[in-house]
Structure formats: structure tokens, C-alpha cells
Amino acid sequence: SAPKPFQVSRPQRRTMLSRHFSSIVENLVGSGDSYAELSVERIITAGGISRSTFYSYFDDKGDLLVAMAQDVIGDLVGVGHAWWDLSPDATKADLRRALRLPINTYRAHRTIFGAVVETAAYDARVREQQQSLIDQVVASLADHITAAQKAGTADSTIDPKRGAQWTVWMLEHGLYQLVSSADETEVEQLLDAVTDMIWRIFYAGYRPEVG
């Protein structure tokens, strides 16, 4: 029998639409409006999508934000592995290179991440998604700290879970408050500062600072 034509599933179609809307929303917010100020009508008009199509896949613009954020959150968690996967003899320069990746990813999608932070204050769906991101990163960092402590390459007096919680929330707020609006020169200085802090907290005296 003839093969069936390729069909896009509903979840796949939702993902495709959310990716389409991501660039639309980034342009609209880049023009000066906050995500909260954007109406569904304005979003779908700019995106060239009918109202019926929009509501076939999204409950409202909060649901759209959850879908748009899913991709960029996955990217952010993915590049975080550059830090978790550092070898036991990784130097401070290696740490700096690893920390650059989430900073670059955040800057590339700062509009969506910023909308997540702002919308999480009043939309439980977005808040749950933000917390899920935090929980994933905290768990990964805590595992990394635990493994490094066992290997003798991180301060063994630090509580891995709570140390990870403090560090991740600090980074989350720093990305939103400091990195999102910084120019290239300032980003480099912020990267230097956060590398110094994390190195001193976890690794100083336990692994070589230079190779």
C-alpha cells in the first residue's frame, strides 16, 4: 500500500507555532511593550495567524508563553552541562568558559526569559514552569558539587543542596537584573565577577587555578 503522507501531530504543531510566535513576541517587546501589555489580537496579527488557529492550540497568551519558554528553557538547561561536566582538574578559565554558555543563551532569548519572570508573578502555569527550571538546575548542580567533594576538588564543608539553591537563585536573578540589559563590555566584566565568586565558594584551594 502507498505510504501515508507525513502528518504533524497536535503537540508538534503547537511547538511549531510557539517557535513562530517567539520571534514575533521578541520583536513586539523589543519595540517597548511588556509581554503583559500585548494583547492576543496584536500577537496573532503580527504573526499572521487566525484567532481560531491560535485558540486551537493555546488557551491564552499565558499558555503561549509556557510553550515559547519550553524551548529556551531546554536550551538553558542543556548548556548548563558545560559546568556540571567539568573535569576534576578544570581550571578557573575552564569554569569561565562554561559559565559563558548560559549567559550567551540567556542573552539570545532575554525577551522570553524576561517575560517568564514578569508573568510568573501572577500566572501559576508560568510560575510552575519557572520553578521546574530552577529545580532541574539545582539538582544538577547539587550532584556536581557532591561528586566534586567526593573527588576532593570542592569544599566539603558546603551543603550541596543548599549551596546549589543559593547559587542558582543568585544566577537567575543576576541574569534577569544585570545581564539582560548589559552591553558586551559589561557582560565580560559580569562574567569575570561571577566566575570569581563561584570559584572562591566551591573550588579555591581544591583544584588548580591555572593549567
Q: Residue spans of the language-model regions?
A:
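All-alpha amphipathic helical-bundle segments outside canonical DNA-binding/catalytic cores
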Residues: 93, 128-133, 150-166, 185-193
